């Protein structure tokens, strides 16, 4: 049997959310299952424009496929998430076809090794700022922006790809101002 919060705790969380104008989870998320359940509840609550700020997922290593196939999402703000132990972001936003805006500012990506197909087929994504992401431990960005056909504004300044061994199709069918030359990301 699943533990249910007493009603006063539940309404306390709702009141905190409404007063602050943003989603805040006071204690950290301890498992990917708990994170998935929480995200589904927030998507149900917010609809196509989701705001889940300052979430502590520091005990989770794998966020693969987390939002994949969410054709209903148009914008998502996940700024300020505590992601210091995440190592695998493979396919996190895979096939989010309608999404136009994603805010991932403030993420600690220093332990991430796999960013393969992270934004694969986010065909309506128009701009994305990933500057400041520590990519020094990443070894694959294969198909990271594959088929992001409207992504013209992309900021990857500060990216260190010296340990990346697989960059295949990273910018295929993507108008972003970057390309892969000699296994390095360069501005066009």
Language-model features, listed with the residues they occupy:
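Negatively charged
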Residues: 2-188
């Amino acid at each position: 049997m699943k533990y249910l919060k007493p009603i006063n705790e539940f309404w306390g969380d709702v009141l905190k959310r409404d007063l602050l104008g943003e989603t805040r989870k006071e204690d950290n998320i301890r498992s990917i299952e708990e994170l998935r359940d929480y995200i589904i509840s927030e998507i149900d609550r917010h609809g196509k424009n989701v705001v889940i700020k300052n979430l502590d997922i520091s005990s989770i290593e794998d966020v693969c496929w987390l939002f994949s196939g969410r054709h209903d999402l148009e914008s998502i703000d996940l700024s300020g998430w505590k992601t210091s132990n995440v190592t695998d972001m493979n396919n996190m936003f895979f096939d989010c076809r309608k999404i136009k805006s994603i805010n991932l500012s403030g993420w600690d990506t220093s332990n991430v090794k796999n960013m393969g197909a992270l934004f694969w087929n986010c065909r309506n994504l128009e701009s994305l700022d990933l500057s400041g992401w520590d990519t020094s431990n990443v070894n694959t960005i294969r198909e990271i922006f594959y088929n992001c056909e409207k992504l013209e504004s992309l900021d990857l300044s500060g990216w260190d790809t010296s340990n990346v061994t697989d960059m295949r199709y990273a910018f295929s069918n993507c108008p972003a101002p970057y390309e892969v030359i000699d296994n390095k990301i360069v501005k066009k």
